[in-house]
């Protein structure tokens, strides 16, 4: 089976040809651990989990190494710890635990390695000193900066004109820079801010810049070059562009990673998600209302490279779909491996640039087959095994029902709020919205009953 993936570097679908098929290597940029992860953060986690599962099927579980870093040194972390009056270590440990719990609820496999930036300072210093020695970086006022003009094909990934790169680089304008595009590899730490012995003979303790962290961790765990580098589309520039510059110039290689993959943006009910708009929602908040599997199916219903509009209606549809699928499989065990033709059909579709919408459409077809054919026992096992490749249907019908009720029991306040919204919509004669709320709740197993006195009560239907 040939795996073709869209490569941001070439702007085309390329066939993955691992540098070493016995050791396929993938790096994905992970979270900065200072707060609860929002639903936008869940998209790359789920997308690259699906790719990890597919790679393991194609090359063998013991032949794929998936590295997703943890950024635990960052100015946002310092500010949040000071705001909360706790130590930086306590903050990063707490938020990393939250992230682990959230991703487990989304049924994501643990990466092979989850390196922390603070545990790779030595590798960062080594890279920085190598870049200075080769003329690609320089020391200025206790900072070390990468000199962008030293790399003739800088910008190859993002393909932005120079003026756009300068405008979008988010770099500080400092008089000690040789060029406005130059970016920080190392900076001094003020009192009370984490600091380590600096490279290049700088006497003041300091801390790394953001970009050098990923270059160091990918080098330490995957080598100078590797197969796949992934992340959100917002990381193409400047983060991934700068990673490439650092790594290629340090190791004198033509590429850092063969494939660069990026997932699209997430919108919330048609709007950009932001705290200022009051529509910022965390994974944990959504998990209080819906089983994680619902979030996962809703996320995979849109192709990973396309923008996704995250809506309650979409979540309701995903919940209804899973309800039907679990009813079909009942308590069946999954049949996995090459002997399951359903799983092979799913793998074929995923091999076309992780075409999860096509996979889900085909799963709907397989569900109908498993539901109506006479040899339904074997077909149910195969259907479940096929869905497992997408990280779905890992439970039994009994377990699914229990998780639904558990989510509902945790969220009576949310249900009450939706009922109030529905009553307001009915009063305003917005019957379409009122019906939509009823359907959303029904998808979660909540049945509404309109009473003669104008109030609405509810009960769990399953």
Swiss-Prot record:
Signal peptide: none annotated. Keywords: Aminoacyl-tRNA synthetase, ATP-binding, Cytoplasm, Ligase, Metal-binding, Nucleotide-binding, Protein biosynthesis, Zinc. It holds the Pfam family CysS_C. GO terms for molecular function: ATP binding; cysteine-tRNA ligase activity; zinc ion binding. CDD domains: CysRS_core. It is found in: Cytoplasm. Binds 1 zinc ion per subunit. A motif ('KMSKS' region) lies at residues 272-276. Its EC number is 6.1.1.16. It catalyses: tRNA(Cys) + L-cysteine + ATP = L-cysteinyl-tRNA(Cys) + AMP + diphosphate. Monomer. This is Cysteine--tRNA ligase.
